[in-house]
Design a protein with these regions (language model features):
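Catalytic phosphate/metal-binding cores of nucleic-acid and nucleotide-processing enzymes, i.e., regions
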Residues: 1-130
Length: 130
């Protein structure tokens, strides 16, 4: 079974590896994908939040930036919409991206990229991975 959102996340990780400032801390959430009921209950008991965005970036201004990755045509679940509204209300950054380019556009105002980083190369990864 193909997982387009997982593939997008892997491509984005590769793209960001050489472009983010070294002091930026970022991580992926444990959400996403199908889980058997036992695993889902276990993860929830450990604090995994249904609807949490896929990626979190700790920014130099004390705020966080969050990105929900979606396959082309993918839509937000009600839980994802609820978490997004809460994050925005708490004055954090949040966005949904269907491509590397959209993720980069969301992240530009966050001041996370190295000076001079080439952000116009998203196709390089998409083409080499195709």
């Amino acid at each position: 079974m193909e997982h387009p959102e997982q593939k997008l996340q892997e491509k984005l990780r590769k793209f960001l590896a050489s472009r983010l400032k070294p002091e930026i801390v970022w991580m992926a959430s444990a959400n996403g994908g199908y889980r058997d009921p036992h695993t889902a209950v276990s993860l929830k008991s450990m604090g995994v939040l249904p609807g949490a965005p896929d990626l979190c970036f700790c920014l130099d201004n004390g705020r966080t930036g969050w990105i929900e990755l979606k396959a082309p045509g993918g839509r937000l679940s009600p839980q994802q919409k609820g978490v997004a509204a809460r994050l925005i209300r708490l004055n954090h950054f949040w966005g949904v991206a269907h491509s590397i380019k959209e993720a980069v556009d969301i992240m530009r105002p966050w001041n996370v990229f190295k000076d001079g980083a080439d952000l116009n190369e998203p196709r390089e990864i998409e083409e080499t991975e195709a």
